[in-house]
Amino acid sequence: MARLSNQSAARFVELWVEKANKRALAIFRDSAQRLGEEANKPEARGGKMPVDTGFLRNSFVASKDGMPTKQSLPLPLVLISVQLGETVYVGWTAKYARRMEFGFEGADKLGRTYSQAGKGFMRSAAQRWPQIVNESARAVKSRIR
């Protein structure tokens, strides 16, 4: 029976922790990316994102500093630098994004009357978060051995 010295046991644990940290970061980044893709998936491809001109869909951005603004970056560029423990904020900068997500009933500032049901593209993606993380974990586990 082989015996591990204290040094080799410590090195084994060190390598295991390093791999676990790499996996955790990869799962975090991959899950956030998948969440964004799910929320932005067009209705024509089975998602809930309505697409007419593509402006709403293309206004999807992310930030590590707070809710995104028009100056924020695309999600993949934010995820490159994000670390475990940081928060990633995502959203759409199109002025009508909130109405498309939640719907709108009533008159707007110009007196136009609406009775529009919400599409729930972000909420439905957020509800799938546990499944998205599990999918990411399986994918990352096969990549980082």
Task: Give residue ranges: language-model regions.
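Short, low-complexity, charged/polar segments at coil/turn and helix-coil boundaries
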Residues: 11, 15-107, 145
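Protruding loop/beta-arch "assembly-hinge" segments enriched in small, turn-prone residues
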Residues: 116-145
